[in-house]
Regions:
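Long C-terminal interaction/binding lobes of large macromolecular proteins
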Residues: 20
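Amphipathic N-proximal alpha-helical interface segments
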Residues: 13-16
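Core segments of cupin and vicinal oxygen chelate
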Residues: 1-10
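Vicinal oxygen chelate
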Residues: 28-75, 79-122
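Long, contiguous binding/interaction regions
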Residues: 24
Length: 122
């Protein structure tokens, strides 16, 4: 698993080895944690409960919350992603997926459904 960036955000795209070609989810970056919590409220009021979150990822140090949309596609709301200013020295780190860094807060347990949802790329 590795992250790619094309601007100052820590990551814009995550790529992982898989047995099938698929797009796991799309993330919508919002201005701050309060805005993310408001989006969670809007989704919950519309009948959508979180698949995973709210929480905070280790890589990127961003807050997150994942939902399944009406077409079973996974949507993420995220805020507070680390920014790496142009010209600033940055040392890449190895990230080994696990519960201790996937959600450093230890809240909003990931459901089995969250792990299984993906949309094949045609």
């Amino acid at each position: 698993f590795f992250f790619l960036r094309c601007n100052q955000q820590h990551h814009v795209l995550g790529v992982e080895n898989s047995d099938n070609s698929s797009l796991n989810h799309v993330a919508f970056h919002v201005e701050d944690l309060d805005a993310m919590m408001r989006r969670i409220g809007v989704m919950s009021n519309a009948g959508y409960e979180p698949l995973w979150g709210p929480g905070r990822h280790g890589p990127g140090d961003n807050c997150f919350c994942y939902f399944e949309g009406p077409d079973s596609f996974v949507l993420e709301f995220t805020s507070e992603l680390i920014e790496v200013p142009d010209g600033e020295e940055w040392t890449p780190k190895e990230w080994i997926p696990g519960p201790e860094n996937a959600n450093v807060w230890g809240t909003g347990g990931r459901t089995e459904k969250a792990a299984s949802l993906s949309v094949p790329i045609a």
